[in-house]
From Swiss-Prot:
Family: Belongs to the PhyH family.
MF term (GO), any: iron ion binding
SUPFAM superfamilies, per database record: Clavaminate synthase-like
Name the UniProt record assigns to this protein: Uncharacterized protein Mb1539
InterPro entries: Phytyl_CoA_dOase-like
Domain of life according to the entry: Bacteria
Transmembrane segments: none
Length: 273
């Protein structure tokens, strides 16, 4: 099965239709080569900083393959992904203008010889948002292919039409009907967060890089409290829309002084539903 692709600058109706029908879509030519090259370099630098701060042993115990969390803390380059017009248009259309970033994770997926990739959560079939709410879309993922997604590089496997299902499909069905989302570097891969998917297995002989974003309605807790993790000063340096996505307008008060504030100073602003 060929991945569902729509051309950049096309009507959002096509993206919405693909999400409704099969649960995912690919938008090509979003990032140019200069941006890709800069992002690759910066991801490796962030990986080194995380390794230094957390330590190889603790990272190994987590049972992850090349996951980079909280990249914005280590390099402001990664804030710019929250300003990309295609990202904002999809988030606004599928969720809401008040949606927030649940996570931004980089992936430097290492290569292994065939049949020797460790079994971890990433390459088991799963949903990023395991809650089906009677057709109510509460979460959407937007992943950037920083390197080409192919069978050999470990393109993400998706099971078309498996989204918005209350019961988990049989594992045999998932394995037999999964298709790799193959796309060029610079493409954007968007999917309903209830879609069953798994990381592919990279046997290409080199790393494969990607960045995944998950956006939710503002009343769902983030994987990381980005406002606290980054600090008020850093968040306030960002554009207003980025502040919104980071959760600046949906913070939880901690005392009565914070609670009894005028509308323009409240931590949890009106209309964040």
């Amino acid at each position: 099965m060929i991945p569902v692709k729509v051309e950049n600058n096309t009507s959002l109706d096509q993206v919405q239709d693909a999400l409704n029908c099969v649960g995912y879509a690919v938008v090509e030519d979003v990032l140019d080569e200069a941006s890709l090259a800069a992002t690759r370099d910066r991801m490796y630098r962030v990986q080194e900083r995380i390794l230094t701060e957390i330590g190889k042993e603790r990272l190994a115990r987590a049972g992850e393959l090349g996951v980079l969390r909280l990249m914005m803390k280590y390099d402001p380059h990664f804030f710019t992904f929250l300003e990309i017009p295609e990202v904002l248009s999809i988030v606004d259309r599928v969720l809401s203008e008040t949606a927030i970033l649940h996570l931004q994770n980089g992936f430097i997926l290492p290569s292994f010889p065939p049949f020797s990739t460790p079994d971890v959560f990433q390459n088991a079939f799963h949903q990023d948002f395991p809650r089906v709410l009677s057709g109510y879309i509460a979460s959407v993922n937007i992943m950037f292919a920083i390197d080409p997604f192919t069978r050999d590089t470990g393109a993400t496997l998706v099971v078309p039409g498996s989204h918005q299902r209350i019961e988990k499909p049989d594992h045999t069905y998932l394995a037999r009907n999964a298709v790799p989302v193959q796309c060029a570097a610079g493409s954007l891969f968007v999917f309903d967060s209830t879609l069953w998917h798994a990381a592919g297995r990279n046997t290409s002989g080199k790393d494969r890089l990607a960045i995944n974003h998950q956006f939710t309605r503002s009343f769902f807790k983030q994987q990381i409290d980005y406002v606290r993790a980054l600090g008020d000063a850093v968040v306030l340096e960002q554009p207003a829309r980025t502040q919104q996505l980071l959760g600046w307008y949906s913070r939880v008060v901690t005392n009565l002084d914070e609670y009894y504030q005028p509308p323009d100073k409240r931590l949890y602003r009106k209309g964040q539903g």
